Regions:
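Short, solvent-exposed coil/turn segments at beta-strand boundaries
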Residues: 15-16, 41-53, 66-78, 125-128, ...
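Short, solvent-exposed secondary-structure boundary motifs
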Residues: 27-38, 53-62, 105-117, 132-138, ...
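Short amphipathic beta-strand/extended segments with alternating polar/hydrophobic composition
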Residues: 32-40, 63-70, 86-96, 143-147, ...
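Residue-level marker for the onset of beta-strands and adjacent loop->beta junctions
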Residues: 38-40, 65, 118, 130, ...
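Short, solvent-exposed aromatic-acidic interface loops
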Residues: 56-63, 81-87, 159-162, 196-201
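Flexible, processing/modification-adjacent segments and terminal tails
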Residues: 78-138, 169
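Gly/Pro-enriched, hydrophobic low-complexity segments
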Residues: 132-217
Length: 219
């Protein structure tokens, strides 16, 4: 973990209070579904952990879905609207709270200085791996970060609730950092190209491929 922090340029710097970032990529809602273009803006707060992610998905020619994923005061919420007007989904509750906290923990890769906050506990998880555990708002999330021989982070895996017919089930949720996917923003070297996959009993379901196009700290 220390080598990763050193290579990121975070050692010796104050913890970033906030991060604003832009994403572009592709997503799909089913293993056999079509890929849909996505653009998103996200803001992450590190003092009292919070984030807001606002995305626009081109579902079909002339049809756009607006999505908003939030985490604040220990509560997660996901809203989806068609044409920015008609509600498609509005989800909250314990499973969403756990999933949002797990997402927050995983996305500390974009705010390396915040990885040393008191609310994150690190422990060894074997060669090239470290387990991070975070408790906030009465909920605990944990996951394993993996690193290459140089100390660069290569991925993250955790268990998160996967929504399916009949109810949500805990499944393995995997983030893979694409080879050569690191960039430097504002003097901070971070991974900028990812894929996100559910590891399900009937096979892997990669549902999101993303690239950071911009990131700004404390603005």
């Amino acid at each position: 973990v220390r080598t990763w922090l050193e290579r990121s340029g975070a050692v010796g710097k104050e913890i970033a209070r906030s991060v604003s970032l832009k994403q572009k990529g592709m997503m799909r809602t089913a293993p056999d579904g079509k890929w849909m273009p996505v653009t998103a803006d996200q803001r992450i707060i590190t003092g009292s952990p919070a984030f807001i992610w606002i995305a626009e998905v081109a579902a079909a020619p002339g049809i756009f879905l607006s999505a908003r994923d939030t985490y604040r005061e220990g509560k997660g919420r996901m809203y989806i609207r068609a044409l920015s007007l008609f509600p498609v989904a509005d989800a909250g509750g314990p499973e969403i709270n756990q999933g949002a906290l797990t997402r927050y923990l995983a996305e500390l890769v974009w705010v390396p200085s915040a990885a040393v906050n008191d609310y994150v506990r690190w422990e060894d998880a074997g060669p090239g791996a470290a387990k991070a555990t975070m408790t906030w708002g009465g909920i605990t999330a944990s996951g394993v970060f993996t690193f290459d021989a140089n100390g660069d982070m290569t991925g993250f895996r955790a268990h998160r609730y996967y929504d399916r017919k009949g109810g949500a089930t805990l499944e393995e949720w995997i983030i893979r950092i694409e080879p050569g996917g690191y960039r430097e923003f504002g003097g901070v070297r971070i991974p900028a190209r990812f894929s996100v996959t559910w590891h399900l009993k009937n096979g892997d379901f990669t549902w999101y491929k993303m690239e950071l196009s911009d990131i700004r700290y404390n603005e």
